[in-house]
Swiss-Prot record:
Transcriptional activator that specifically binds 5'-GATA-3' or 5'-GAT-3' motifs within gene promoters. May be involved in the regulation of some light-responsive genes. A zinc finger (GATA-type) spans 154-208. Its main location: nucleus. It comes from Arabidopsis thaliana (Mouse-ear cress). It is found in: Nucleus. This is GATA transcription factor 4. It comes from the Eukaryota. SUPFAM superfamilies: Glucocorticoid receptor-like (DNA-binding domain). One of its GO terms (biological process) is positive regulation of DNA-templated transcription. Belongs to the type IV zinc-finger family. Class A subfamily. Residues 104-124 are annotated as: Disordered.
């Protein structure tokens, strides 16, 4: 039978293409399973080597029988343990018993010792003084202030040299010296207004027509006095 111009023997058989035999499938699956198992075993034990190329290292007898470590790693661990022991040996076992080092003291230049002259004894240097020296060494008394004789009466009472008052709360300085004026006269003298026409009302020399204790009244009295003096000095006009 011709199909598309070709004879039947030349065509491929469908049975050859559709081969459902299980031999290759099961063989390939077993191969994959064995390779997966070998890879898993190698991942669990990364230090496993083929028996033909691997020789078991010599084990150290210092460690326990359960722990098997290669000689190179054991030497490294032994060096590390010794280093740690040496490091901890530098510290004291009991930190409370540590002694604090004293602070460094900077010593300066040593002082040079010089011989000092012995202090003179009082008994050896004291000499008795003569009577004349003793008289001069005695402190002279402070001289008392001598006031003006006019301010002191014969019986020793003090009085004002301007108004002759003997009673005043305070004595003040005047033209004749300290404590020569009464309080009223001393205040006016200090301000420059002490004139002969001024008298306190309590003064024993107070005259009403000649003296006053008011500054305005005193100025009027002085003006009147000046006018009187000018009239006396100018002679009256005498026609010839």
């Amino acid at each position: 039978m011709d199909v598309y111009g070709m004879s039947s023997p030349d065509l491929l058989r469908i049975d050859d293409l559709l081969d459902f035999s299980n031999d290759e499938i099961f063989s390939s699956s077993s191969t994959v399973t064995s390779s997966a198992a070998s890879s898993a075993a190698s991942s669990e034990n990364p230090f496993s080597f083929p028996s033909s190329t691997y020789t078991s290292p010599t084990l150290l007898t210092d460690f326990t029988h359960d722990l098997c470590v290669p000689s190179d790693d054991a030497a490294h661990l032994e060096w590390l343990s010794r280093f740690v022991d040496d490091s901890f040996s530098d510290f004291p076992a009991n930190p409370l018993t540590m002694t604090v080092r004293p602070e460094i003291s900077f010593t300066g230049k040593p002082r040079s010792r010089r011989s000092r002259a012995p202090a003179p004894s009082v008994a050896g240097t004291w000499a008795p003084m003569s009577e004349s020296e003793l008289c001069h060494s005695v402190a002279k008394p402070k001289p008392k202030k001598v006031y003006n004789a006019e301010s002191v009466t014969a019986d020793g009472a003090r009085r004002c040299t301007h108004c002759a008052s003997e009673k005043t709360p305070q004595w003040r300085t005047g033209p004749l010296g300290p404590k020569t004026l009464c309080n009223a006269c001393g205040v006016r003298y200090k301000s420059g207004r002490l004139v002969p026409e001024y008298r306190p009302a309590s003064s024993p020399t107070f005259v009403l027509t000649q003296h006053s204790n008011s500054h305005r009244k005193v100025m009027e009295l002085r003006r009147q006095k000046e006018q009187q003096e000018s009239c006396v000095r100018i002679p009256p006009f005498q026609p010839q």
